[in-house]
Structure formats: structure tokens, C-alpha cells
Amino acid sequence: MKDYYRWAKEFSDKHIVPYADEIDREGKFPKEIFDKIAEEGFFKILVPKEFGGEGAGIKEHAQVTQAFAEGTATAGLCYTMSNVALKFTLTFGRDEIKQQVVKDIMENNKFMSLARSEFGTGVHVFNSQMQVENHEDYSIMNGSKSMITSANYASYYLISVPADEKRGPVNWLVPYGTEGLEFSESDWNGLGMRGNNSCPMYMKDMKLDNKYAIYIDRQKANQKYPVNIDVIYFMAGLTAVYTGLGKTIYEAAKAHALNRKYPGDKTLANIETVLLHISHLFNNAFVAESALNAATEAMANEEPDAFEKIMTARVTASLNCVDSANLGMRIGGGAAYNSKGPLSRLMRDALAAPVMFPSVDVLRNWVGKIITGQNLM
């Protein structure tokens, strides 16, 4: 059986880790790394075997994402976005559009992204303000999306729009280069994950063939949980990102403690309080990774409470990551505050954890509703 984590970890150590500081410093999308990710075949893992892919599932999706995030959170997040958009397309898309997208991924090394957040509604991505004018063979769209990961680099963008009055919930797949589609890269100046290029996306009189409409038929697609499969993959991916990031914070803080010398040949690691902090970091990383593995295993087995486990794992990884980042800075001290070493970069990356959709507060609310038998939506 293929070890997806090891495969991705070896790639990450060779092709991502050496460039993590540069990605953060320049704040640019790591195109060369993503070209290598595509060439190595990582974007193909969710493609069904009948299309020539590996037919992998949520566990493998999380394992690869975590390994990439251990190199830099930017790589993990941008990778997971592509997988989520692909999973949605494979689940709900018509054969024509599935074949087109799969061919581009398999033969042309393309990848995808999500475009759902908006300026007015923020993380409430199901409440789109997009304007869609439907015609017989095409539709005209006007509107904007606020923070689009991999903007200007992904080849397809999955956008949310208001439900169709006749056919119900729908997303659209927007090919890069569509007339009327623009990105504002100058508006991206992220505190952390600076290589995401999560800039605004504008659509002005954008004309799309109606084949790019992906209608959400939950019954036909056999959706077993209260939200669609793409949301579940997204939460698993974010859990993996912050699990990987938390693991790297632990390793970086431990390395600093072992290498920081005092007179008398002692190190920070010889101080009892610092040992307690390092132990705390290990605990955070271990708990997050254990929760991720348990939740994705439950989802792979379609266990009844798998959705609650995925959400709880996401909350755990997010809060543990932020806690570890703060503790890592305490261990790093003045050197970390002066941006010597990776700990200050890792802290900035971690601060995205509690606020990304679905936010920690939203997730806790959802878990509470489900375990008390209330309607989620």
C-alpha cells in the first residue's frame, strides 16, 4: 500500500522546505514548486482510477496536505484548495465537465482553487451576492470574491452564486482567462501564509457557457452528512494544514532550545520551564495529528459521527496551532522576535487558523447542534 505521507514528506523536504523563508519574504505564489507538485502527480491522487488517477480518498488528501504544510503552510493550503474544488466537480459535475477538468489535470498539469468568500458576507460563503443572468446556452455574471487562494495561478476557480430559482443550489467553474475575469494582486498583503496570493477576484459581464454550471443534487450524489463532500474535504484539509504547521512549530522551538547555548555549556533545553513548554508543544502536535487521523479514518469508513469528528479535529488543530505559535515565540525569545529563525514566520501563519471558514466559533456551534439533535442549517 502506498504511503502518501512519506511520499509527500520526501517531496516537501526537498522542494518546499528550502524555499519557505523566501516564499514568506517575497509574498509571491510559489509557481515553480506547484509546477513540480503537478509533475510529480500529487494533483492526480483524487482522480478516479477509471480516468487514470489513483482513486485516493480523504485520508490520503489529508496526509499529503499535512506533509506539504510541514514545509510551509502556503503549500499545504493551496494544494488542499485544488483537491476540494476537484472533489466537488467529480461529485456533482456532468460527465462533460468532469472529463475536461480531469484531462487538464492528468495531461496538462493544471490545478484548481475555490472562490467563495465575498466582501459583504465573509466566511458565510453560502450567502453569495453574485448576479447571474441566465440565457439558453450561456450566462452573464457580475460580482466579486474577496480572498481567492492561488489567484491568477490556478486554471479553474469554483465560485458560489445564489441558488437557481428553477434548479436549486449551483456553483460555477470559471476557467482562467475567461473574458471579464480579473484579479487584483496588489490588494494581497497577508500577515501570514504570504505565498497564497489570496487577492480579490472581479467578474464584470463575464460570459460562461452553461456547461460550467455545476448543480448540487445531494440525493443523486448520495451525500450522507449535513454538508456537501467538498466542505468536509475542506475541513479535513485545513485540519491537516494546521496539524502540519503545529508540528513544524514544535520542531523549530525544540531545535532552538537545544542550540541556544549558555555559559557552562548548558542550553535552553536544560531549563525546567523550557522543558515544560517543549512538552506542551509535543502534546499539541500529537493531539492534533491523532484527531486528524481518527477523523479522516471515521469519514473514510462513513461512520455516523464522522462529521462531528472532522469538525472537532479542525477546532483542535486550529487552537493548538495558535497556542503552539505563542509558546514557540516564548521559547524563541528575542531571537524569534527579531525574526531570527522560522518561529516568527510560523506564528504569523498560525494566526489564520481560527478565522478561516468555517471559523472555530461556527464549528463549535455546528457540533453543539448535531450532538444535541438540532438542525444544522
Describe every region a protein language model picked out.
Residues 239, 246, 253, 281, ...:
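Amphipathic alpha-helices that form helix-helix packing interfaces
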Residues 12, 64, 141-143, 203, ...:
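Buried hydrophobic positions in well-ordered alpha/beta secondary-structure cores of metabolic enzymes
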Residues 144-183:
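A short core secondary-structure module
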Residues 190-285:
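Glycine-rich beta->alpha junctions and the first turn(s) of the following alpha-helix
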